[in-house]
Design a protein with these regions (language model features):
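Charged DNA-binding/catalytic regions of mobile-element recombinases
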Residues: 1-180
Length: 180
């Protein structure tokens, strides 16, 4: 039950002027204790904040649906971000595309096989794996899942970014909202 690939509306314009204007998403895979764990996050291009995420042992339609629902629930009235992904089957399923359309969100997709079109998401996955996954031996998927959740909380609330003037993503958004 697949829809068509959306056009690349984002066009590598990775700067956003306000929160919830441009979101990007993707899925990454980890291994622990002989099992796999998949992470499906949404990143806000305004401040690099992970606004929603889900993990599961299989990269299913359900994983992406739960992640999307969390993202949609976080939106305030009138917020309709562009949501950019690759052309993975998860993002071409009719139910996913309908959920976006029902909320008035515009879907954008990378060109086929072009990971640079979603560079900010790839960059986040790189930091995540470098800082909490590589060189560590997780005995179980549960232990790894806890570490992923802790890292994302740290990323959002504590990890400073020079591009945000030395603030964390949440601090940067809070400052912006106070000034607004």
């Amino acid at each position: 039950n697949m829809g068509l690939a959306a056009e690349n509306i984002l066009q590598r314009q990775f700067k956003a002027e306000a929160p919830c204007e441009k979101w990007v998403t993707d899925i990454t895979e980890f291994r622990a204790g002989g099992q796999k764990l998949y992470l499906s996050p949404i990143l806000d291009l305004f401040n690099g904040e992970i606004v929603a995420w889900e993990t599961a042992c299989r990269p299913t339609e359900e994983l992406v649906k739960r992640m999307l629902n969390k993202g949609l629930e976080s939106l305030a009235e009138g917020e309709k971000p562009l949501l950019h992904s690759d052309q993975g089957w998860h993002y071409r399923i009719k139910s996913y595309q309908s959920a976006l359309a029902d909320k008035g969100l515009v879907q954008s997709m990378s060109r086929k096989g072009n990971c640079l079109d979603n560079a900010v998401m790839e960059n986040f996955f790189g930091h995540l794996k470098e800082e909490m996954y590589y060189r560590r031996d997780y005995r179980s998927v549960e232990e790894l899942e806890n570490a992923v959740n802790e890292y994302i909380t740290y990323w959002n609330q504590k990890r400073i970014k020079l591009s945000l003037g030395g603030l964390s993503p949440v601090e940067y958004r809070t400052e912006y909202q106070k000034a607004g």
